[in-house]
């Protein structure tokens, strides 16, 4: 029994020992799967050196190690054998005996052979140790970090300290600055907070912002048999800074459980081939194949004699259209017909002065000549030419000798063409020649025989994506150091090198064909330009004792004469089609003459705060992503862009876009800049560098670097659904009852709102999150209203910065036209005189002139009066009133000052008549004659003499005006106290009709007479500014 009992006890102990041994083995096995990591101490980490690729974190996520390269080991438990570099994958092959994969096998790094859709533009990032410094809170903070891109502004501490010293010297006075309170946003895990700081030269800090932190992007560590697959690409915005990966199994999947999608058989065209079959990531299914063009297939056909190849369709390099398709046709060339003249294939002909055509396959392909910019005050377009040329100022005709050119003798003022590009003018016996200025807007201009300026056979508007130029880092040069600008690389980006004078001037004379015996003229930068220097003047020394502050006058040869200048020399580079304005002394000033200038808003000064919330210094230029902008005296001036009007009722401007679009409209509308010119305003006017004007009552524009930049009024938020804009308002207004907020008295509700970006708004505060939306904070809830855009009738509506809806600028700008006559430009409705007999008028671009015809005179010996067109009889001539002393020389050669007998009367002046008119003394007051109180005339003389004089005057006028209407004497009885006159000529009024005034001239001019309520039977003279007022169409 005991034995049995003892056997049973031993058996129980044996079972217990076996159980304990199995538990220990299980713990031992499980211990091999555990990963024990000590607390991270980066000071004990060794920096990996000479890594052939990038670096990755170790298994414990503390220290860095070199990433495994192609054909190196990887995988294992927790990736203990290594992690493959970017662009490689860890491939673990199944065992040869058919067993399933475990997590202990080691893999090999191989290339990733995924499709483009699976990779999503996956690119490796080579992280390196980068050292540098940044200015933070007025101090230089330096550090050394491992990153992909350089986050430092200065590469060394010395450069940072020198920049900090320069900033301290230019630091503004911030004692009175008022800065807005900036709230710091809460950043996602993949980004870091950049605290707002005050830029150099500014007092207020910029808002704090979140920026992506590449070091915070971690890739998942997948178990063996799985691979990191890129699912979505990072967008660069906080919250989307990192690429998103998922772990997917690799070749360890049982394909029997995988259902593959059907793959259609690809049939490729004859000009292409089918690519090889590829497998999916799990190795179970095949991917669709695609067609690619065959290499070396395209060629030029060889046609038989008598036929030539002609292209049928152009190839674009895609399967089915890999090559151009030709056909052989007969040699009979189709012709182009223009003005009943046939032109064959390849022939060029001229449609008008500026358009040339080439006949191609029976179709006329026309192009426009390319004219360049001219920098002169006076210019003209030669007859039969397109591009203007500069013209010398008009000199008085002093030399009767002409110019000898091309075997002909030409007179003063004559112009002729020397060659294709040179035009000359005869000025006082000397030939002055200038060259045509040509422009170039295409890469391959074509020279037309017999023409100066080339033409572009490709479209004249070339759309080129601007190069993505980064900031000019590690460069201590400033704009003051490089007065001629910075050099640019092949991508058009600035480099840290200045343009010297030789490089700047080399382009000024490029293509110049003038042969100038006395050299070339120079511009403001002392660079030679394509214009000849005139013959040097040989002047004799003069002796002049006059003191002339403004210098002496010059004769036609450019030599000084002993006469003083009354006006200073005009040094101005502006191009003014209407000429320059004059000051009170009649001297020209550097300001263009305008027909009418509307008063604009006052010009501010200082820095600009843009609509986007950025600060810019005065005269600073920048590009806001959509348009070119410029800071002018505190105003943000931006170029107008052309945008289509959205069709929906609640448009918005999406991030990264420039034009308003609808929510479901995914087509990015690229804005077009308004047609660039040499500051050619939308209204048709020309402006020069630095000039400002108003295109309407709401928009002020300026000319900067050859582009029209405009600023507009910033509009407040609109708290209604359907705002509208009237012609007399600059901003849209709420036509219906606007939303009026009422403050809540519920203390349990917070008195602020918070949007999705973390911005905080107070109760009843309104704002515009974008230019098309207005919001308001009520009871901690944000309510928003969208603006809808009305339809427009123009082809190219423009969009001002800061506004939502495009509009037609043609509706607000009156079209102004200019008349060109004798080399001068005149504004619309402007008048001028060619001489005393010919008067001209500009009407809508047409020049209309009228000539006065002189009537026969009853006298035998008429006289010519200076300033008058027609001669007149001596008894009709009455000298005009004057009180200017006249110089007369007596018989001894002395100069006497003599005042005329008819002084200009002023108030309370007494006029003494000559002796031959009797002893009549009158007092001139209130513009009327009054008998003097101390007159000694007797009663008979005071009555008879005036009657005789009046009857003589009346008989003389009735005889002269016998063809005119008789003047009823009763009409003169109602003449007002102020006499009516026109151009110092006698005015006769028809009292019965009251609407026509006849001037004593052979060409009678019609005037409109309107009743004046102050005087009974009197009509005031109202000058009308149109052709019917001056009778340019007919004479009576």
Swiss-Prot record:
Q: Where would you say this protein principally sits, based on its record? A: membrane
**Which Gene3D superfamilies would you find in this protein's record?**
4.10.40.20, 6.20.200.20, Antistasin, domain 1
Q: Does the keyword Kinase apply?
A: no
Q: Which residues form the IGFBP N-terminal domain?
A: 35-112
Query: What InterPro entries does its record include?
Result: Antistasin-like (IPR004094), CRIM1 (IPR052624), CRIM1_C (IPR045813), Growth_fac_rcpt_cys_sf (IPR009030), Hirudin/antistatin (IPR011061), IGFBP-like (IPR000867), VWF_dom (IPR001007)
An example GO BP is:
nervous system development
| Stretches of the chain found on the membrane's Extracellular side | 35-939
Coordinates of motif Cell attachment site in the sequence? Answer: 314-316
Instruction: Outline which residue ranges sit on the Cytoplasmic face.
Output: 961-1036
Q: How does it assemble?
A: Interacts with BMP4 and BMP7.
Q: Which gene encodes it?
A: CRIM1
Signal peptide annotation:
1-34
* Function statement: May play a role in CNS development by interacting with growth factors implicated in motor neuron differentiation and survival. May play a role in capillary formation and maintenance during angiogenesis. Modulates BMP activity by affecting its processing and delivery to the cell surface.
Could you name the Gene Ontology cellular component terms for this entry? extracellular region; membrane; plasma membrane
Which UniProt keyword terms apply here?
A: Cell membrane, Disulfide bond, Glycoprotein, Membrane, Phosphoprotein, Repeat, Secreted, Signal, Transmembrane, Transmembrane helix
Q: Name one Pfam family in it.
A: Antistasin
Please identify the protein, giving its name as recorded: Cysteine-rich motor neuron 1 protein
Q: How does it sit in the membrane?
A: Single-pass type I membrane protein
How does the record describe the protein's post-translational processing? Answer: N-glycosylated.
Q: Where in the cell is it found?
A: Cell membrane
Organism of origin: Homo sapiens
Residues annotated as carrying Phosphothreonine in the record are 1035
